[in-house]
């Protein structure tokens, strides 16, 4: 699990950024005219007016990846479990102006507690934790493409892998993005989230699980989607990705 505290100052005309490292760090992609990396907690200052009119947005992000259905606490293997995760997330985000809970895939498969019910147990726990969005890892396709869609519904989470298309070019999942607006002192901070999955994962699952799907170039899609969200007025763009290539 990774937790990130981000403070956004909205109301002036130049961008500044200050870095503060946490013990646990995460990497997110933010778009403010450019795309840059966010490491740990970083106050970001977006300016478009006078300083006296600035509004600070306290946004807290909880991020997980590669859970592999390890939902039960296991101190020996340093697994905190979903129960503790939920409590930590609730405590961490309390009092924030806004929060997001995100996952980068390989979530629904990997332990008997999940495989015996085709991922439903994990999906229900994700719903209880309050996840907002996730992207897919190769193991999430293990129960088949339609079951993966069903699990997203059970979890009440948006599955974002917009570079995965049907044969007719339409997106396989119901939506390509999550947009969250946070309003404070008459100003609104708009956060856009999208997801990409490595095309190589099509070759890392049983062919029937992804039959008829086109896994398009992840980098090209990410560039287009970041530009789209920026054009739609997003102050912040977060990319969720699951890749098999460490150089991607």
Segments the model singles out, each with a brief description of its role:
Residues 6-12, 30, 37-39, 74-76, ...:
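Compositionally biased, intrinsically disordered low-complexity segments
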Residues 21-44:
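Sec-dependent N-terminal signal peptides of Gram-positive bacterial secreted proteins and lipoproteins
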């Amino acid at each position: 699990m990774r937790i990130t505290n981000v403070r956004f100052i909205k109301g002036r005309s130049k961008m500044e950024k200050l870095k503060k490292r946490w013990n646990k760090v995460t990497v997110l992609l933010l778009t403010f005219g450019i795309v840059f990396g966010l490491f740990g907690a970083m106050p970001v200052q977006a300016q478009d007016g006078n300083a006296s009119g600035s509004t600070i947005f306290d946004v807290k992000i909880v991020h997980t990846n590669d859970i592999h259905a390890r939902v039960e606490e296991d101190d020996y293997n340093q697994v905190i479990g979903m129960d503790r995760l939920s409590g930590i997330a609730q405590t961490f985000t309390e009092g924030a102006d806004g929060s997001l809970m995100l996952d980068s895939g390989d979530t629904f498969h990997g332990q008997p507690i999940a495989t015996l019910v085709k991922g439903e147990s994990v999906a229900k726990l994700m719903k209880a934790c309050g996840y907002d969005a996730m992207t897919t890892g190769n193991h999430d396709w293990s129960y088949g493409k339609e079951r993966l869609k069903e699990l997203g519904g059970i979890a009440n989470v948006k599955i974002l892998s917009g570079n995965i298309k049907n044969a007719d070019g339409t997106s396989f999942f119901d939506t390509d993005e999550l947009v969250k607006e946070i309003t404070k002192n008459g100003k609104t901070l708009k956060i856009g989230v999208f997801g990409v999955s490595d095309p190589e994962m099509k070759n890392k699952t049983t062919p029937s699980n992804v039959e008829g799907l086109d896994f398009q170039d992840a980098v090209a899609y990410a560039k287009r989607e970041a530009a789209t969200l920026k054009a739609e007025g997003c102050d912040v763009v977060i990319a969720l990705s699951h890749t098999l290539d460490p150089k991607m």
